[in-house]
Every structure is written in structure tokens, then in C-alpha cells.
Design a protein with these regions (language model features):
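N-terminal interaction/assembly modules
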Residues: 1-136
């Protein structure tokens, strides 16, 4: 697993744990860093802070492109992987779009339901197809 793949997994861990605790992700990140358990890769922090900064727009896009699913109905892992994927597609200009989608699908393949890879691929694919028309 490459450095950025590990950073994505660690960012997912932080986002997921924060959601389960009812904590803000940035607070969870800062707490982990202060406790010496923080990410060793700056990209993890970039991902968590990016998702936090753009979360209203990310969640709006997910609501628009997750046909038949509300954010609340999605498994928490899928929801947070999708947030990471949309962030990378829309705001991480140094990440190729195909890599953002592939990495998101790989995360849910390992950590979520059997249906999750197809769902995540479909949602991110729809965002990607419409990316040029979407406002950041």
C-alpha cells in the first residue's frame, strides 16, 4: 500500500471515529496529533481538513448523486469514503480523477458491504461525469 493510500485509510479512520463519537473531525485530528497518534503523512491532515472545509458542498453533491439513498441511510464507512472521494475529485488537483475513484472503491471493498464498491463507483462516477458543470 502506497503512502497516499495509507493516508486515505488513516483519514477515513479519523472521519469515521469522529462521526461515531459525535465529534468534529478536525477536533479528532487535533486530538490524535496532540496525543502523538496523529498521521505521519501530511496528506492525511490535508484530506481531513479538506473534507471539513468543503463538507456542506460535498454532502450536497452526495445527496444529488446518491440515487435512492440519503446520507443518513448509507453505511458510515461508505458515507465517509464518498466524502473523501468527492473532495479528491473536486478540490485535490494533484490527484488524477481515476485514482480518486479507484482508491475510494478499494477502501470500501476492504471495509464495507459487498454492494459498497459498486455503489461508491457509481456515485463518484456520476460526480466525475458532471464535474465540469459543478461548482466548487
Amino acid at each position: 500500500m502506497g503512502a497516499r493510500s495509507k493516508a486515505r485509510k488513516r483519514a477515513l479512520d479519523i472521519l469515521y471515529a469522529a462521526e461515531m463519537r459525535g465529534e468534529e473531525p478536525a477536533t479528532a485530528l487535533d486530538r490524535a496529533i496532540a496525543a502523538g497518534e496523529g498521521p505521519t503523512n501530511d496528506y492525511t491532515s490535508d484530506l481531513v481538513r479538506g473534507v471539513v472545509e468543503h463538507r456542506p458542498r460535498i454532502d450536497e453533491l452526495l445527496a444529488d448523486y446518491s440515487e435512492g439513498w440519503t446520507l443518513d441511510r448509507m453505511p458510515a464507512v461508505d458515507r465517509n469514503v464518498l466524502r473523501l472521494g468527492v473532495f479528491e475529485l473536486m478540490w485535490a488537483d494533484d490527484v488524477p480523477d481515476a485514482v480518486a475513484v479507484t482508491e475510494a472503491v478499494a477502501l470500501v471493498q476492504d471495509l464495507s458491504t459487498d454492494e459498497s464498491p459498486g455503489f461508491v463507483n457509481g456515485v463518484l462516477g456520476a460526480v466525475l461525469r458532471n464535474k465540469d458543470a459543478l461548482t466548487r
